Amino acid sequence: MIGLIGRKVGMTRVFTEEGVSIPVTVVEVEANRIAQVKTLETDGYAAIQVTAGTKKANRVNKAEAGHFAKAGVEAGRGLWEFRLENGEEFAVGSELTVELFNEVKKVDVTGTSKGKGFQGTVKRWNFRTQDMTHGNSLSHRAPGSIGQCQTPGRVFKGKKMAGHMGAERVTTQNLEIVRVDAERNLLLIKGAVPGATGGNVIVKPAVKA
């Protein structure tokens, strides 16, 4: 399913004709340039590889420079891939713009969530705190028991414990497109999308729409 690579600009609000305020996230989608077309015969699956934005020349290594030069496209800030459905055809060097979403009502947005560093179980997993008083000493935000005794004699995999929180790939599904601004290459999406301002996001038509 074809999507677009954008950059999260921030949040604002727009008003309907009735005066209702809608909170929106602004996503800037510069033209996505196709750097490679993968086919069933040569690669084992059908997909397009796209790049977006720009990158300083001294930040582009030789492998990337050769790859972009072969495709005849300007080096971008990264490379992303979209699987192709049956019968879809694209040419290397062509561009994808926000107009791809003119007829789309709902989208799924994927980004990298804000990193929170090492966090305890209360913040990371919404554990309840223990008593502040009534004889409780130094165990107010402690997780409590993490298992049983000699049997099984170990902590089960997946046990919710303190650790690194955030900075992981997150997808928010079924967000509504409020406006497509083709002149300024902007998508206005209702609600919040994952990640920090300036972060890369992948916008695709909703799979559950």
UniProtKB/Swiss-Prot annotation:
Highest taxon of the lineage: Bacteria
Keywords carried by this UniProt record: Methylation, Ribonucleoprotein, Ribosomal protein, RNA-binding, rRNA-binding
MF terms in GO: rRNA binding; structural constituent of ribosome
Entry's Gene Ontology cellular component terms: cytosolic large ribosomal subunit
InterPro entries (UniProt xref): Ribosomal_uL3 (IPR000597), Ribosomal_uL3_bac/org-type (IPR019927), Ribosomal_uL3_CS (IPR019926), Transl_B-barrel_sf (IPR009000)
Protein role: One of the primary rRNA binding proteins, it binds directly near the 3'-end of the 23S rRNA, where it nucleates assembly of the 50S subunit.
UniProt cross-references to HAMAP family, sorted A to Z: Ribosomal_uL3_B (MF_01325_B)
Protein name as annotated: Large ribosomal subunit protein uL3
